[in-house]
């Protein structure tokens, strides 16, 4: 009977393994509550060996959150195919897939904390927000956004973050409802801005022109009209 020989990992392969193990642990508990000993045990190596690949706890956490940030930023990439509302809903579905699968890690990434409060980690969060901003503009077909559109998009990204964090705290509102609501929120923010600025009005009209009569943005307009008091 032969005994299998454990293959020795290369440096980069081992680093990637440790990052993956850390992210898996972060999906269940905050990075602040995960120790290097736990990461080492889950990876099947000794604590000193972890420090051979990462100089300290913070450097491992930052590497893990870098991968998570790259993953999250990628969730906003969407082909320009189909109505704008439907495309945005697909993006929100992938966004909440990430939030659902990396709850404590997502919360730590967005809120910061002792383990993840460095300037490097803050820069990671900013990079995710910027990637989301660029992708939304691409969906709108705009490369040089006017100031009011930038305000709308960045405000909406902040709203999506806050909504996800609140949802994680008890999940008291159905996820599918929030995904749809965030699409409507984007349309509402754009509509309010369009009501006060002609340049935004042109952009909003162009978006609505690509929406079918039963699309998500049209649905919001119908719901708002239904809320208006009926004239006697």
Outline where the language-model segments fall.
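Alpha-helical DNA-contacting segments of helix-turn-helix folds
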Residues: 59-68, 109, 124-128
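Hydrophobic alpha-helical connector segments
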Residues: 63, 77-104, 142-146, 179
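C-terminal peripheral helix-coil segments that are non-catalytic and often amphipathic
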Residues: 1-2, 134-138, 169-232
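Amphipathic alpha-helical packing segments from all-alpha helical-bundle domains
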Residues: 117-143, 149-162, 176-191
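Short, Lys/Arg-enriched C-terminal cap helix and immediately downstream tail that follows
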Residues: 62-63, 73, 190
